[in-house]
Amino acid sequence: MSFDNSARCGAMNAADEIIGPPLAQGLADQPAIVGGARSVTYGELEAMVNRTGNAMKAHGVGRGERVLFLMDDSPEMVAGYLGAMRIGAVAVALNVRLAPRDVRYVIEDSACRLLFVDAEFAHLYQEIAGELADPPQVVVRGAPQRIGMALDDFVAGQPDTLASEPAAPEDIAFWVYSSGTTGRPKAVMHSHGCVLIADRMEAEYFGVRPGDRIFATSKMFFGWALGHSMMGGLRCGATVIVAAGWPDPVRMIEVVDTHRPTLFFSTPVMYRNLLREGVGASEGFRNVRHFLSAGEKLPETLYQSWLEATGKPLIDGIGASETIFLFLVNDAGAQRPGSCGKPVPWAEVRLVDEAGADVVEPDIPGQIAIRTPSQFRGYWNLPEQTAKSLRDGWYFPGDMFSFDRDGYWYHNGRADDMLKISGQWVSPSEIEGCAMTAPGIAEAVVVGVPQEDGLTRLVLVAVPKDPSASQSRLSTQVQDTLMANLSIYKCPRTVRFVDELPRTATGKIQKFRLRELLKAGRL
């Protein structure tokens, strides 16, 4: 098997392209994954991948069948993910903060054959297991549960060698679930061939090589960590750092001080929170060579605050679940604060106006279109959305951009009403519909309001059925309803009440007026 970047034709396998290069370089004894007190070498990871892949085959998982992972980042999760791709199955990592109803939806939507779940998240499956017409086989990592079989038993006695299932570059290797315009998760399908560029940004922009350590604060269900930390880091022969538990700034500082990454991937909201925790005093952060930011717009004020606190800049870029890897990024030596950088050499990027013509002059907004080797193959079971987003070989994400005379690109917002909160797409209409099921709520509108630090928070503006009702009680009721039915990142922490919503002459709600009132502190 060739692990050369030119291996674009003929049989291949994504798992081989990710873990094969470091093994071919003789790095079997070097650490591939570290976390907590554990360290797993490339040779040990290869054996884990093969045992898990063999176990999947023994339990009837076949080519093209979906294998879901409701797991925290860990060597076992990575081994299972690569093992699924190695046998020709489709690996799918899930957000561990999904609501049970969303877990049910994903299981049914994917028609998955096998579900790996950590014991601490088993309740998310148990709550909906009885509602499934065709439940998957379940494998549990951690404390014994009343469902499925233990991971140790699942892989026990399996060989640590495994011949990879040959795949064409365009065959599907993995999915990434991303929220759709209705709020329902949608499966973004990626091919085996897309991983062939997994290492290019790390190697060509930031000089990553064996001996480097990469840490992404985001979890691997998120394309930022999956593509650039796990896939890119391993393909470069670097060490990938994983951290148990949901990321919080205090814990992230502890991880950095313990494991000393040389490359650090995170989001603007985490960088802001790290500053609040006094990251400048951390010895581990002084060891980091490059700090990269993606997932949402990086405010210039946050860029400057980070530079003052650490002495090193935040390198901003932008990608998407549909591209897995960044398509715009600032160069470490030539940054433009406030911009997303310039197109990477392996991606084509252009702007189009409302008539579909190319925008060729600077400082004129248009809708961005991207063409890259890592482009997704479509949305599972959503042909209309696929046709809307993939046109003549170009991916249209629905984002508005402009570029300046020096070729730096700037994000101008969404063409539709979707909002990005903590790096994840949120559908206001889904939240609004849920809020209006709460007792006493007649109407509800969700808007994104910029904070002083430039990030966005969700605010729910509601009209009570009874204007004399206690707003405190109504606020509690609506927030309880949201928390019971939606994933936590979709739940606004702020609720405001009005007698009526501002509307146009044709009856359309004017969200911009609500946003202006909230920004001015008049609501």
From Swiss-Prot:
One of its GO terms (biological process) is secondary metabolite biosynthetic process. It is an enzyme of class 6 (ligase). Its EC number is 6.2.1.37. One of its GO terms (molecular function) is CoA-ligase activity. Keywords: ATP-binding, Ligase, Nucleotide-binding. It catalyses: 3-hydroxybenzoate + ATP + CoA = 3-hydroxybenzoyl-CoA + AMP + diphosphate; 4-hydroxybenzoate + ATP + CoA = 4-hydroxybenzoyl-CoA + AMP + diphosphate. Gene3D superfamilies: 3.30.300.30, N-terminal domain of ligase-like. InterPro entries: AMP-bd_C, AMP-bd_C_sf, AMP-dep_synth/lig_dom, ANL_N_sf, Benz_CoA_lig. Induction: Transcriptionally regulated by HbdR. Belongs to the ATP-dependent AMP-binding enzyme family. Benzoate-CoA ligase subfamily. Ligase involved in the anaerobic degradation of 3-hydroxybenzoate (3OHBz). Catalyzes the activation of 3-hydroxybenzoate to 3-hydroxybenzoyl-CoA. Also shows high activity with protocatechuate and 4-hydroxybenzoate. Exhibits lower activity with benzoate, but cannot use 2-hydroxybenzoate or benzoate analogs containing other substituents at the ortho position, such as 2-aminobenzoate (anthranilate). NCBIfam families: benz_CoA_lig. This is 3-hydroxybenzoate--CoA ligase. The lineage of its organism: Bacteria, Pseudomonadati, Pseudomonadota, Betaproteobacteria, Rhodocyclales. The gene is hbdA.
